Amino acid sequence: MASIDLASTPLTATQNVDPNEIKKFEDMASRWWDLEGEFKPLHQINPLRLNYVLEKANGLFGKRVLDVGCGGGILAESMAREGAQVTGLDMGKEPLEVARLHALETGTKLTYIQSTVEAHAEANPHTYDVVTCMEMLEHVPDPLSVIQSCAKLVKPGGHVFFSTLNRNVKSYLFAIVGAEKLLKIVPEGTHDHNKFIRPSELLKMVDHTALQEQGITGLHYNPFTDTYRLGSNVDVNYIVHTRLF
């Protein structure tokens, strides 16, 4: 049911891609759908992310949706099951293969493409009703370029969602010391705190596009119950909702 286009342009130094980041996630790709593996946090937060998108975008049924930095397809597949026409975009070949195979196993219909968001935006301007870019901005050299490309890809009136990690002492303690070093929730080295993005910085980048911020919410982890919830505090993880008018 899933189709995949791996005929992308070769990886070059001019692309907005960090080869080390690509390799890191390719090495873990086979375990992407292991609910107790390295990507357990993504599986845990996915219902929250999905419900947030559904609420703000007034549902996804029949809409064209692009998931930028889709990896193994956790969010992309869940949006497709809501009736959306989903395209998942990533530069990692192995995660895309895993995503395609999982979609075949579950009978989920969607399309995966190996491409940078910049190249996809050039070829597909104002194509999508909804664009999601979750936990991806902190893994690329130039997050502004990604945000600008997302703005090009969405239709007028459409929605664009960004999620990333705040850069402060608390996020270092929670995301690096706690999650990676102590609790081992994610592999050590998954994140670079210097690449985290403050909400004020992300919103300034949004201001360089035609997108308009519609709201921001935090994503909170409770280590005692091993659960996540949405809330007003954006000290660590957060999601920004924007629209193109």
Curated annotation (Swiss-Prot):
Involved pathway(s): Cofactor biosynthesis; ubiquinone biosynthesis
Catalytic activity, reaction form: a 3-demethylubiquinol + S-adenosyl-L-methionine = a ubiquinol + S-adenosyl-L-homocysteine + H(+); a 3-(all-trans-polyprenyl)benzene-1,2-diol + S-adenosyl-L-methionine = a 2-methoxy-6-(all-trans-polyprenyl)phenol + S-adenosyl-L-homocysteine + H(+)
Domain of life: Bacteria
EC identifiers of the protein: 2.1.1.222, 2.1.1.64
Family annotation (CDD domains): AdoMet_MTases
Presence of keyword Methyltransferase: yes
Keyword set, alphabetical order: Methyltransferase, S-adenosyl-L-methionine, Transferase, Ubiquinone biosynthesis
Coiled coil region boundaries: none
Binding site for S-adenosyl-L-methionine: R49, G69, D90, M134
EC class of the enzyme, as a word: transferase
Gene Ontology molecular function, alphabetical: 2-polyprenyl-6-hydroxyphenol methylase activity; 3-demethylubiquinol 3-O-methyltransferase activity; methyltransferase activity; polyprenyldihydroxybenzoate methyltransferase activity
Biological processes, Gene Ontology terms: methylation
Name of the protein in its database record: Ubiquinone biosynthesis O-methyltransferase
Pfam families: Methyltransf_23
Family of this protein: Belongs to the methyltransferase superfamily. UbiG/COQ3 family.
Function as written in the Swiss-Prot or TrEMBL entry: O-methyltransferase that catalyzes the 2 O-methylation steps in the ubiquinone biosynthetic pathway.
